[in-house]
């Protein structure tokens, strides 16, 4: 017998009430164990989408997912940072957080980048990295070794979260974003102690930063970019939540105060896989457009803050721009590529 009544739990969600930690964990375990009918799963996913998700609901589900993750190795004993967005902003930008991962790693930050292919026909982090020569199906021991040897690695989500495979057809059939799009950034198998996470909607700022706090992160930045970007944006003021030692601070980030130029999000457009690959190659060598370089530097400054490397965001911007100018991200990319071969 389930520890909760599924009809009662569904009714609770449909009434837009917050479900408890026990209920959220029971629901996730039922999904992972294939205990619910497809129609029940569809109803729960729809009900969760229709209500305002809470930090407790997210962290409770994420804990179950992390525990179910395949990880037959000791966790790397280094202070790691993940950088990603939830997606769903519709802006079709190039792979900003992927570029940021290599820029910041080239400056000494240890990056555990957790990502996947795009489910929307766009170009996800895994798509662009594979196109550039990163081996997604590398033996998991090499993925672990890379972070110890090169201070950066890429964790291809399906290789670690095989328990979610049975849900993939239903999620695809629903055709809309679900709670799993929010959970993806929260379930990095390496359990980094710091993270920079972008959200496409401002109402997700507080639930996501609260979830990160519940999951035990020491430092984190959750950002909602101007113009609805799930990255820090050059278009205008960015809403930010900073998490440090359990304390959450809300701030508005003015890009001009950081020495950057206001630019519309349209200047950050990506395109085909080949286009996005070319943009990353250019940025890794200090080329690309001014807007492309500056948005990567802006988001890199948040990673530097989260890592503790540089708490002054303006100085962080300068560090990132100089790294690109010296082609340091390209060297770091080539190191990872060789390590995973």
Swiss-Prot record:
Query: What is the E.C. number?
Result: 2.4.2.18
Q: In which pathway does it act?
A: Amino-acid biosynthesis; L-tryptophan biosynthesis; L-tryptophan from chorismate: step 2/5
- For binding anthranilate 2, which residues are annotated in this chain's numbering? 171
Q: Name one Pfam family in it.
A: Glycos_transf_3
Question: Where 5-phospho-alpha-D-ribose 1-diphosphate is bound, by residue?
Answer: 85, 88-89, 93, 95-98, 113-121, 125
InterPro entries in the record = Anthranilate_Pribosyl_Tfrase (IPR005940), Glycosyl_Trfase_fam3 (IPR000312), Glycosyl_Trfase_fam3_N_dom (IPR017459), Glycosyl_Trfase_fam3_N_dom_sf (IPR036320), Nuc_phospho_transferase (IPR035902)
- Cofactor: bound how, per the entry note? Binds 2 magnesium ions per monomer.
Task: Give the binding site residues for anthranilate 1.
Answer: 85, 116
Q: Which GO terms describe its molecular function?
A: anthranilate phosphoribosyltransferase activity; magnesium ion binding
Please provide, in alphabetical order, the Gene Ontology terms of the cellular component aspect for this entry. cytosol
Biological process annotations from GO: L-tryptophan biosynthetic process
- What reaction does this enzyme carry out catalytically? N-(5-phospho-beta-D-ribosyl)anthranilate + diphosphate = 5-phospho-alpha-D-ribose 1-diphosphate + anthranilate
List the SUPFAM superfamilies hit by this protein, alphabetically.
Nucleoside phosphorylase/phosphoribosyltransferase catalytic domain (SSF52418), Nucleoside phosphorylase/phosphoribosyltransferase N-terminal domain (SSF47648)
Q: What class of enzyme is it?
A: transferase
Q: Which UniProt keywords apply?
A: Amino-acid biosynthesis, Aromatic amino acid biosynthesis, Glycosyltransferase, Magnesium, Metal-binding, Transferase, Tryptophan biosynthesis
Q: Which residues form a coiled coil?
A: none
Q: What does this protein do?
A: Catalyzes the transfer of the phosphoribosyl group of 5-phosphorylribose-1-pyrophosphate (PRPP) to anthranilate to yield N-(5'-phosphoribosyl)-anthranilate (PRA).
Q: Which family does it belong to?
A: Belongs to the anthranilate phosphoribosyltransferase family.
Matches recorded under NCBIfam families:
trpD (TIGR01245)
Q: What is this protein called?
A: Anthranilate phosphoribosyltransferase
Lineage of the species this protein comes from: Bacteria, Bacillati, Cyanobacteriota, Cyanophyceae, Synechococcales
